[in-house]
From Swiss-Prot:
Belongs to the GatB/GatE family. GatB subfamily. The gene is gatB. The keyword Nucleotide-binding applies. GO terms for biological process: glutaminyl-tRNAGln biosynthesis via transamidation; translation. One of its GO terms (molecular function) is asparaginyl-tRNA synthase (glutamine-hydrolyzing) activity. Pfam families: GatB_N, GatB_Yqey. This is Aspartyl/glutamyl-tRNA(Asn/Gln) amidotransferase subunit B. It comes from Chlorobaculum tepidum (strain ATCC 49652 / DSM 12025 / NBRC 103806 / TLS). The keyword Protein biosynthesis applies. Allows the formation of correctly charged Asn-tRNA(Asn) or Gln-tRNA(Gln) through the transamidation of misacylated Asp-tRNA(Asn) or Glu-tRNA(Gln) in organisms which lack either or both of asparaginyl-tRNA or glutaminyl-tRNA synthetases. The reaction takes place in the presence of glutamine and ATP through an activated phospho-Asp-tRNA(Asn) or phospho-Glu-tRNA(Gln). Disulfide bonds: none annotated.
Amino acid sequence: MNYEIVVGLEVHCQLNTESKAFCGCSAKFGKPANTNVCPVCLALPGALPVLNARVVEDAVKLGLATNCTIARHSILARKNYFYPDLPKGYQISQYEEPICSEGVIHIDLEEGGKDVRLVRIHIEEDAGKSIHDIGDDTYIDVNRCGVPLLEIVSYPDMRTPKEASAYLQKLRQIVRYLGISDGNMEEGSLRCDANVSVRPVGATEYGTRTEIKNMNSFRNVERAIEYEAKRHIEVIEGGGTIVQETRLWDADKLETRSMRGKEHAHDYRYFPDPDLVPVLVDDGMIRRMQEELPEFPEDRAARFVSEFGIPAYDAGVITVDRELADYFESTVKVSGDAKASSNWVMGEVMRTLKEKYLDIHKFAISPERLGGLIKLINAGAISNTIAKQVFEIMQQDEATAEAIVEREGLAQVSDRGAIEAAIREILEANQKQLEQYRSGKTQLFGFFVGQCMQKMKGKANPKMVNDILRSMLDA
């Protein structure tokens, strides 16, 4: 029997607000344990929460970006459960009345596009963190308590692990473009739980699902879903029954293991939080958030193609990341050459970012300096080969490309006499290859070009070398 995988994702997106969701403590990651805390975080008697307005604005922005219905009136609720790193014994969340509902995210796949529907987006606060790797004891860090989250819940519309990964990547792209989160899975600012089930192809009823946690990369999301789906099929075909439960993904063993029975909503005893007033969103806020929405990747890529004349592929690669697209556009303003700018950004810049594990905002070469380097190439002042040397120097040196070229003596040689003299020496030193070339082995032309460029330390004008060499070889 052939089976179909059914996947829905619950994604927690940590917002990059300065302060927490319900108090004035810093929400920044990486501070010493238990330093970003106050009576509200610690649930001390009499401490009352106050909702951070920025959290509501970010939720509305994400709702607008994903074509959700924005609730004019929504309720904050208490989600009750016990865990050592949850001082209050409940988490402030939303249940019956979320701030956003019924949205859609479009994903691009090799076989075409697909829409994944959203059930809801709701506001939530994060819990603390239990630390188990210090000696034999368990420690609690409550810095993370109260850090604002948005939970994005999809319908079970995905049918393959790759679709789930593509959806998650698109969601990360959206929150990054909006500027509401860095979407860093490794640091936990984007966390994903997958609900997985299988059913016979053609069936309309859903199978029993399991929830998978502890997936900290897109690759692990794919692997975990693939493993869990295969496990379901093996259990069913072996005559067993799938138990609805929560399972942990073990990235070292590449398998899931049982964690606990899957909770239902009634297990959390949700009820409206009496300490917090309803969340009200008016038309003015929606208009203001709409005006603050950025130009999204698809629109920006289309503009790059029409305005700059670069290929659609280049535009698609560059606009994956908002900051990279900003970098490219700033480079074009200086260089005046969009295609050369896209080649450098997609080539040397992205290669360096990957090798050094950098984000573009930490890259040493500003778009203004890269644009200046491209202008030198186009002016014939340096060759592409020399430009790559200058590019490497610029990563360690704050000087402009022009200053580095002058200081290092890297200017391109366009002196016809000097190039002719170098070629003459090359031909005299390689008589055998010269005879072979003139006997019809014309592929040796590249050999002579390489020898000449090597002799002139890469500084010779490539076009002049080609033209002069061809005339001397054919003489």
